[in-house]
């Protein structure tokens, strides 16, 4: 049994991770979260009274408070997810991204390093700092280029991805310089229950059922690799417990889709699952509206995940069709929880 400190555990991926740990292991979870607009405590309702779960409202940039958390709970591992993550918000206001994603990661690393030095040799050996990051640090690909591997250079395009690339570099530096036992994972686009409504899939679902336009950037031909959040958190825990210290692992769904394909499939599922439409709309696809493209919009993301497949035997279990159907159903019946 481990004491696992999860940062950003009230967010979309963090809450899914905590639910997975509580439901599938005997580990104790300390969730620290600042509770920004993207947090959703209802995503943790099923575990909030579990004796192996505790929540602390904390800003990861507050060094003294973070030190107290480490002292109080004596974590065996850190799973660092706390981050500002919406690309559009980073374009209109980058300061929060620099502060949380870079300064916050630095603060955690410093506290973790100092704490790690106080541990006995056995606990030092088993301690892990797992930094959960994004495929966007690699930049984008043309349609003909091979997928990104863990050796691909970083070439971020947005303030968001630049801040995550910087945080990855900090984590690697604390390993190289101080010996802190770290692991980094870079995942592709996640989707599933409890995702904030600003993201593509929940935005399209909520707009469609309200009869609002479905805004699609540019021509909608941007390609993303889609990963069901439950698959992601299972892989993340596997990397924490079985991955090699100092290594990076890509976690993807092996499922490349254009944004237009995704939106059209959502509309098709809604025709089946929510046939009663608002505002005398004939077809959900009639709501699709092409809008001015995002500045510096990446063309394609694709991850080569052969490393995690070969070393840890992990493969995604949920197909995009299964996951998207499950997600659409969830939003239709839980609109107040998203």
Curated annotation (Swiss-Prot):
Keyword NAD belongs to the record: yes
Cofactor(s) needed for function: NAD(+)
A single GO molecular function term of this UniProt record: dTDP-glucose 4,6-dehydratase activity
Binding site for substrate: 85, 134, 189, 199-200, 215-217, 224, 259, 293-297
Matching InterPro entries: dTDP_Gluc_deHydtase, NAD(P)-bd_dom, NAD(P)-bd_dom_sf
Free-text remark on how the cofactor is bound: Binds 1 NAD(+) per subunit.
Active site: 135-136, 160
Any Gene Ontology biological process: dTDP-rhamnose biosynthetic process
Homology family: Belongs to the NAD(P)-dependent epimerase/dehydratase family. dTDP-glucose dehydratase subfamily.
Protein name listed in UniProt: dTDP-glucose 4,6-dehydratase
UniProt organism field: Haemophilus influenzae (strain ATCC 51907 / DSM 11121 / KW20 / Rd)
Gene: rffG
């Amino acid at each position: 049994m481990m004491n696992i400190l999860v940062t950003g555990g009230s967010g979309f991926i963090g809450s899914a991770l905590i639910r997975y740990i509580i439901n599938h292991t005997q580990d104790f979870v300390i969730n620290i979260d600042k509770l920004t607009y993207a947090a959703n405590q209802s995503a943790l309702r099923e575990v909030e009274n579990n004796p192996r779960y505790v929540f602390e409202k904390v800003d990861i940039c507050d060094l003294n408070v973070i030190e107290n958390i480490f002292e109080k709970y004596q974590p065996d591992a850190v799973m660092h997810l706390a981050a500002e993550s919406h690309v559009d918000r980073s374009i209109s206001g980058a300061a929060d991204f620099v502060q949380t994603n870079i300064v916050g990661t630095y603060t955690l690393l410093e506290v973790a390093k100092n704490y790690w030095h106080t541990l006995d040799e056995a606990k030092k050996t088993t301690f892990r700092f797992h930094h959960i990051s994004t495929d966007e640090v690699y930049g984008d690909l043309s349609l003909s280029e091979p997928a990104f591997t863990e050796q691909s250079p970083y070439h971020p395009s947005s303030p968001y991805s630049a801040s995550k690339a910087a945080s990855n570099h900090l984590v690697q530096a604390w390993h190289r310089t101080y010996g802190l036992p770290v692991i980094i994972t870079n995942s592709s686009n996640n989707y599933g229950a409890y995702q904030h409504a600003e993201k593509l899939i929940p935005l399209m679902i909520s707009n469609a059922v309200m009869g609002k336009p479905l805004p699609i950037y540019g021509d909608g031909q941007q390609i993303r690799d889609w990963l069901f959040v439950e698959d992601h958190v299972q892989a993340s825990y596997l990397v924490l417990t079985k991955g090699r210290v100092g290594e990076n692992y890509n976690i993807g769904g092996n499922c490349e889709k254009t944004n237009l394909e995704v939106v059209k499939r959502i509309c098709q599922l809604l025709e089946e699952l929510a046939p009663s439409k608002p505002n005398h709309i004939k077809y959900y696809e009639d709501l699709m509206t092409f809008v001015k493209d995002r500045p510096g919009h990446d063309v394609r993301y694709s991850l080569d995940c052969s490393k995690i497949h070969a070393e840890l035997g992990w493969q995604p279990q949920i197909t995009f069709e299964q996951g998207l159907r499950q997600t659409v159903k969830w939003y239709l019946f839980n609109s107040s929880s998203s």
